[in-house]
């Protein structure tokens, strides 16, 4: 059964997350994971988060009266090189595809901030207080920006726009909405097993995307890329056969677990957990079984082998279980199993 290669690996029932004091920083926790999977998943997700998520960024700027980036502007305290460095740090959210044109015009004295830019459509400036430049009295400045969408880092020489305009300065673009990603792998306990992995991913964004959503997008990218390597059709799960028109489940589920040839430890653990029938047992997941006191991986493997011989496995869903007259049914179908 090839599906055992992935079905028998333990995996988290859910992923938890919490936001830090800075709302743009979030930690995502996944546990328990098989030993080694914390490092494998953490490193892969980190790389995809930093390199492959799409975002918006300014790709070029035109400043009235400026021909190149090594100029200075009368009445503006910063030179053009410093202004461009400040422009690179403007964080944007844009749902539509680019390019788009934005304009800012301001007279001095005063500070020109990102929030002074006139946006269009659904575009949003995420750090409106960010300073672009400072104007002295009687100074003025008009700038036109080109905004585009993409992923990763694109240097200025790839942002050249050949539209014949003089003074259009291409700039480096950091499209990624992710600022920082780190991960930590620790040991965690599940039942009697002490060395499972606990993965904690900490993501800092520029506010264009929620950190939890960013992890989901990265996981979807990995899923899509890895699907190329799957060269087989996954076997379909076989439903539990109905052995009798009166029952909606296999009568073998009415067999009591104490009739199985289990070790004393395994049998006692099932008894203490009020698991009486096989139907009770197969609806338990591996994670639930490992949380049973004194129940370890050895007992889990023993039970899985016994169930496999009967064509059953843990984690099955039996909608009609338990029947109201389970004791009577167990006696009636005793000879059939």
Curated annotation (Swiss-Prot):
GO terms for cellular component: cytoplasm; DNA-directed RNA polymerase complex. The keyword Magnesium does not apply. Residues 1-233 are annotated as: Alpha N-terminal domain (alpha-NTD). Pfam families: RNA_pol_A_bac, RNA_pol_A_CTD, RNA_pol_L. The keyword Nucleotidyltransferase applies. Keywords: DNA-directed RNA polymerase, Nucleotidyltransferase, Transcription, Transferase. Belongs to the RNA polymerase alpha chain family. DNA-dependent RNA polymerase catalyzes the transcription of DNA into RNA using the four ribonucleoside triphosphates as substrates. This is DNA-directed RNA polymerase subunit alpha.
């Amino acid at each position: 059964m090839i599906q055992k290669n992935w079905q028998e690996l333990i995996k988290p029932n859910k992923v938890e997350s919490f936001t830090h004091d800075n709302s743009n920083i979030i930690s995502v926790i996944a546990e328990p994971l098989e030993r080694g999977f914390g490092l494998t998943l953490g490193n892969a997700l980190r790389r995809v988060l930093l390199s492959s998520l799409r975002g918006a960024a300014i790709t070029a700027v035109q400043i009235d009266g400026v021909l190149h980036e090594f100029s200075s502007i009368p009445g503006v305290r910063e030179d053009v090189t410093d202004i461009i460095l400040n422009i690179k740090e403007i964080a944007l959210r844009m749902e539509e595809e680019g390019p788009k044109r934005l304009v800012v015009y301001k007279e001095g004295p005063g500070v020109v901030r990102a929030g002074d830019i006139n946006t269009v459509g659904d575009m949003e400036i995420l750090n409106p207080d960010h300073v672009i430049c400072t104007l002295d009295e009687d100074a003025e400045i008009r700038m036109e920006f080109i905004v585009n969408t993409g992923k990763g880092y694109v240097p200025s020489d790839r942002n050249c726009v050949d539209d014949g305009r003089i003074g259009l300065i291409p700039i480096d673009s950091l499209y990624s909405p992710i600022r920082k990603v780190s991960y930590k792998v620790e040991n965690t306990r599940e039942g009697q097993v002490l060395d499972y992995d606990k993965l904690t991913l900490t993501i800092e964004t520029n506010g264009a995307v929620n950190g939890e959503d960013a992890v989901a997008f990265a996981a979807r990218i990995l899923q899509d890329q890895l699907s190329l390597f799957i060269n087989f059709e996954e076997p379909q799960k076989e439903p539990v056969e109905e052995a009798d028109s009166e029952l909606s489940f296999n009568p073998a589920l009415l067999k009591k677990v104490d009739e199985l040839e289990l070790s004393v430890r395994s049998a006692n653990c099932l008894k203490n957990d009020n698991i009486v029938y096989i139907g009770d047992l197969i609806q338990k997941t591996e994670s639930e079984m490992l949380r049973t006191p004194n129940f370890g991986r050895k007992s889990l493997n023993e039970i899985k082998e016994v169930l496999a011989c009967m064509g059953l496995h843990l984690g099955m869903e039996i909608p009609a279980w338990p029947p109201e007259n389970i004791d009577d049914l167990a006696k009636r179908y005793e000879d059939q199993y």
